[in-house]
Amino acid sequence: MAETKSQQSRLLVTLTALFAAFCGLYLLIGGAWLVVLGGSWYYPIAGLVMLGVTVMLFRGKRAALWLYAALLLATMIWGVWEVGFDFWALTPRSDILVFFGIWLILPFVWRRLPVPSAGAVGALVVALLISGGMLTWAGFNDPQEVNGTLSADATPAAPISTVADGDWPAYGRNQEGQRFSPLKQINADNVKNLKEAWVFRTGDLKQPNDPGEITNEVTPIKVGDTLFLCTAHQRLFALDAATGKEKWHFDPQLNADPSFQHVTCRGVSYHEAKADNAPADVVADCPRRIILPVNDGRLFAVNADNGKLCETFANKGILNLQTNMPVTTPGMYEPTSPPIITDKTIVIAGAVTDNFSTREPSGVIRGFDVNTGKLLWAFDPGAKDPNAIPSDEHHFTLNSPNSWAPAAYDAKLDLVYLPMGVTTPDIWGGNRTPEQERYASSIVALNATTGKLAWSYQTVHHDLWDMDMPSQPTLADIEVNGKTVPVIYAPAKTGNIFVLDRRNGELVVPAPEKPVPQGAAKGDYVTKTQPFSDLSFRPKKDLTGADMWGATMFDQLVCRVIFHQLRYEGIFTPPSEQGTLVFPGNLGMFEWGGISVDPNRQVAIANPMALPFVSKLIPRGPGNPMEPPKDAKGSGTESGVQPQYGVPYGVTLNPFLSPFGLPCKQPAWGYISALDLKTNEVVWKKRIGTPQDSLPFPMPVKLPFTMGMPMLGGPISTAGNVLFIGATADNYLRAYNMSNGEKLWEARLPAGGQATPMTYEVNGKQYVVISAGGHGSFSTKMGDYIVAYALPDDAK
C-alpha cells in the first residue's frame, strides 16, 4: 500500500514537472526565435526559469514554488509595463501561469515535494493574490474607455428634407443618411422595459448554390403603415408595421452561384409618383413604387400597394443594368445598396468583384428617369469623358472605380454624394490609368439631374489597401465658428472621418497630408503622403509586439513571431511578397453601417472597429497564371486567395489570426462611441460585444464581461436620448444612453444581427426593428428573422 502511494506521488510530481518542462521548452525555443526577429526577451527568460522550476520539481524541492512565485510576479510587472492595467491584454500573459500556480499550491501537490523550503507555499500564495488583485483592478479600470458626458442641450435644426416623424422612408431614415429619429416614446428612462412585439420569418435561407458571402444586411423602410424590406436573395416583402403580418411579397428570382462575391441586399428605395412630377399613365399604373436592386444586375420597380411590377417602368418593370457593360458575367457587377431617389431620377451604382482581373465591369454611376427607367445620364469614373453616353459601339470603361455603399442626397442643392471604391485589382496598381486614379477612394458629388461633377475629394491616393469609402455619408448643418455650415461627414476605412463643406468639397475639419511608408512592389509605386483628418478614430500609435494577443501565452508568442516576420511600418505600409500587416484592416474601422448624427444636439454616434489583416502578394508562376483560365469565375469571397488576373501578382487577404483562430491583436476590436460635432472630440467610447457566440462550443448563458467584438452594421439614435445597435459578432440588439454610453438594455436575437436597426411609430406606438439573419463570412448564426420591439402598453 505504501509503495502504491509512493508511486502515485512520483507520478503526480512527474506529470507536474513534465508540464513545466513543456512550457519552459516552448517559451525558450519560441522566445529565442522571437528575439532573433527583434522581439521581446521575456519569453526565453521565462522559458529558462520554467526549466529551473522543472528541475526543482523533479528533485522534489519545494523551493520550486519560490522560483515560480518570482516568475509570476515578474510576469505581471512586465505585463503592466507593456500594456498597462488592461484586463484583456494581461490575460494571455498570465492565465496559464496563474492556473499552474493554483495547481502548485494545492496540498496534494506541494506535499508530494519532500525537500522542504521555508515559506515557499506562502510566497506563491502571496504572488497569486497579488496577481489576482492586479487582474481584478484591471477588470474594473479599462484604459481603452473614454468616460465623458455629452451635453443635453438641443437646438432644433432646420431639416434638409421633410420626413414624417413616425416614418423611416429611406435607408438612413432620410436621404441625408442621418439615421436619427425624432421619436422619444422610447427613452433612456423606459427603454429597459422593451419587449418583443412581433417576429416575421421571411423563409429566405442559405441555398446550396450560394457563396459563403451570403449576408442579411437589410434596414427596412417604413412609409405610412407599411414596412418594406428585402432579403439576402432580394425577395421583397411588405409587412403591416403594427403586427408584422405579410401584406404581399415579390420574388425577382435571383439566380446566384458560388462565384458571386456577395449575395445581399442592404435596402430598397421608395418613390411616390404624383401628377406634378409624373405622366398620367405612370400615376395610374404605379403611384407608389419600391425600387429593388438585384445582385445579377437588374433593377425592379414594384407597386408598393400590391407587389406587382410597374408596367410603365423600363421593360415592364425591369431595368437591365448590364446594358453597355464591357463584361456581363452575372455576379461581376452587383447593386447591393438602395439607390438615391429624387423627383426625377434614380441614381444607382454597384459593386464590382474585387481582385479578380483587369477585365471586369465598369463601376459607372447612372441616372435613370424615376418614372420610365430611361437612361438620363452616366458618370463613368474611369472614362476620359465620364459623362459620355454609351452606344452599340461604345461600352462603359473596364474596371472603373465603383461605388458600392449607399449614397446620400441633398435635395436643396440637388447633389448626390457617392462614396467611391478603388479600381480593381485592388492590391497592385502599377497599371492604373490617370482616369482610374482620379476619383478612386473619394467622395464624389454629382448633380442628380444631369450627372455633372460638382466636386470630388480623394481620401486615399493610389489606394493599394482596398481602403474604399465604405459608408453612406451623412449630411448635417453644423455650427462652425458661429456660422451654420452645410457639411458632409464621410467615414473611411482608415478610421478618418472627413468633414467637408458639401456645397464645394472644401475641408471644414483639417486633413493635412502626412508622410507614409515607401517601397512598393516591383512595377508599382506609393504616394509620398496621405490625408489624415483631425476627426478620426484611427489608432493613435502603430502596433508593436506588445499589442499581440492570444488565448494563452503560447499562441500569443506565435502571434508575436508572425508579427515580426511581416512588413509593418504603420498605416499605409505597402503590399509586399513578404506579407504586409494592414491596420486598419480590409474590413476597415468603418464599414457600410456608417454613423448616426443627431442634428439638434450636434452629436454623432459611431461604432469603429480595429481588426488587422495580412496581405501577401504572390508572383506569377506555376498555378498562378497571368491570364484567367477559360470560363474562370470569381472566388465567392473577398478573403483568401484572390487571383488579380492581368497584373504581375495574385494576393492572399486574411484576418491576422492566431493558431486558435483568434485575432492576433489584443481586444478591443469594436467600440461604440460618441462625438461632439461642435468640438470634434470623442466624448465617450466603450467596448461593445462579448465572445458568447464566437467560442468553439455553445454558450447558452450570457457572458458577464464585455470584450469589444468585431461588427458589421451601424447605430441609430433617437430624440429619446437612446441609441440602438446590433452589428456585433454576438447575437444581441443593445440600447445605450446617448449622453454617457451606459448600456441600458439588450435583447438576445435568434440569429446574427449584422444589420442596422430602424425605428418608427404606428398607431401611437414606437417600434424598433432589426433584421436577424446572420452573416456568412462573419460566421454568425444564419436565419430569416425580422424582429420588432416595443414598450408594453402600461410602460410608456
Residue positions per predicted region:
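Segments forming glycine/polar-rich beta-alpha architectures that bind adenosine-containing cofactors
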Residues: 502, 574-575, 580-612, 617-619
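Repeat-blade elements of multi-bladed beta-propeller folds
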Residues: 168-172, 212-233, 260-298, 331-357, ...
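N-terminal pre-domain segments of enzymes
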Residues: 133-182, 530-538, 542-554, 633-638
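Topology signature of small-to-medium multi-pass alpha-helical membrane proteins
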Residues: 1-149
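Hydrophobic or amphipathic alpha-helical targeting/insertion segments
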Residues: 99-115, 120-141, 239-246, 264-271, ...
